[in-house]
Amino acid sequence: MANKWVYTFKEGNMTMRNLLGGKGANLAEMTEIGLPVPQGFTITTEACTQYYEDGRKINDEIMAQAMEGVAWMEKENGKKFGDLKNPLLVSVRSGARASMPGMMDTILNLGLNDDVVAAMIAGNPDPKFERFVYDSYRRFIQMFSDVVMEVGKKYFEQLIDKMKADRGVKFDVDLTAADLKELAEQFKAEYKNQLGTEFPSDPVEQLKLAIEAVFRSWDNPRANVYRRDNDIPYSWGTAVNVMPMVFGNLNDQSGTGVAFTRDPATGENKLMGEFLINAQGEDVVAGVRTPMPIAQMEQEFPEAYAEFLKVCETLENHYHDMQDMEFTVENKKLYMLQCRNGKRTAPAALKIACDLVDEGHKTPAEAVAMIDPRNLDTLLHPQFDAAALKAATPLGKGLGASPGAACGKVVFTADDAESWAERGEKVVLVRLETSPEDITGMKAAQGILTVRGGMTSHAAVVARGMGTCCVSGCGDINMDEENKKFTLAGQTFTEGSEISIDGTTGNIYAGIIPT
């Protein structure tokens, strides 16, 4: 029997984490218990090991099985990969055995090229649909260039910012179909300028390059840092999940969100999460736009929200633990894209463990085993001196994304956070939004403050996992990253200015408040 490198979501279950990775095993498990999951397949962790053994190449056998997976997906979904009439577009996502937030890479909208884009638009005369297609295309070119070809995101962000400035608009959603079409052309030109070759138009070649990129990212510097800190063996490898795209950016009847079945900061038993209308999942997690609280989804999409509440209950009853979920609504229909046991602060871990015993989900012994002893010291998080806090006036407020109190000197890059901390300075890292590359600087800082992003953004999730104080989504900050300064409530802060942030309330103060 030849090796089986590929499993469809109907062939796996949650006991197969070692082979399918956490994400793949949970997608298969959600399929098995009847939840709405777009039907795709997983390339195993063993294929990742084989990729490294073959000198960082995907062998023909693995690729052939992946294409069989594509053919199965085409049958399940009634669309064809690379077809001009009814194209199947896919996402390619990593999924290791242990959850590694933001460490590994995702590519969305794969399968688009100039011909597919033109055919999709010709088949649907609605001008809003045209905008959606060009939006998906420019996102794909940007992600593929960044993740697969390692052309920095910043080149594309600069083109977007320039386009918005030229058009006099503030948000990406305000760009028109014509603007996005022009952006896609600019992105392809930038790709050629950086790499000297044309952007690949063959969907099969795109897929192969994307799978290789996920395997390669298992060995990238930030993944290695996270593995070292969390005792994850190098030999485990990562799986690759390929699934049909569902589009949260299709129209205003669509959206995307991230939610926790309980509050990951306090442990309170209430749904906590965030939602963006007319957006793709990356927008919520990457903190590109600051989203709205999940409860507002009830007004926008009552049927999908009611179904989502049922899904949350089903998942908690099934996994007997707090779940962290990603979902998309396409034309009012709910799709589940991921679930996993959610990362939580130490106080939340204690409360959730006790509550799960009271609710009959866990025995006391199981509840004790859920608590990571390394996290208990963060119960002694620094708190501001109560009298000093009372006397201080907050300059501004963001979201209290990870509890604790932090004060120190302002720095604007992860590298500066590291070098200042090595000199013994206490620093607060201030960013527009953090990305996985910032992990070493986030570790070095006393606290993290971001202008964009919500409670489920990269900064918030990683900070909670590390027990570091974080305030996210303070949109009142006027940021000038290039000149290393920001303005808040009329005060300008430069590199080395002193600042205090409260990760419980989200308040931001000038100067140092004693802890």
Describe these PLM feature segments.
Residues 56-58, 487-490:
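Short, hinge-like loop/turn segments at secondary-structure boundaries
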Residues 406, 410-416:
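Long, structured protein-protein interaction/assembly regions in large complexes
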Residues 482, 489-515:
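Internal insertion modules embedded within essential enzymes
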Residues 365, 389-407:
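Catalytic domains of riboflavin
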Residues 429, 449-450, 488:
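Surface-exposed strand-loop junctions at beta-sheet edges and helix termini
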Residues 467-479:
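Acidic, glycine-rich catalytic loops of TOPRIM or P-loop NTPase phosphate-binding modules used
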Residues 451, 471-473, 501-502:
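Generic beta-sheet signal
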Residues 1-392, 419, 425-428, 435-440, ...:
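Nucleotide/phosphate-binding sheet-loop regions of phosphoryl- and nucleotidyl-transfer enzymes
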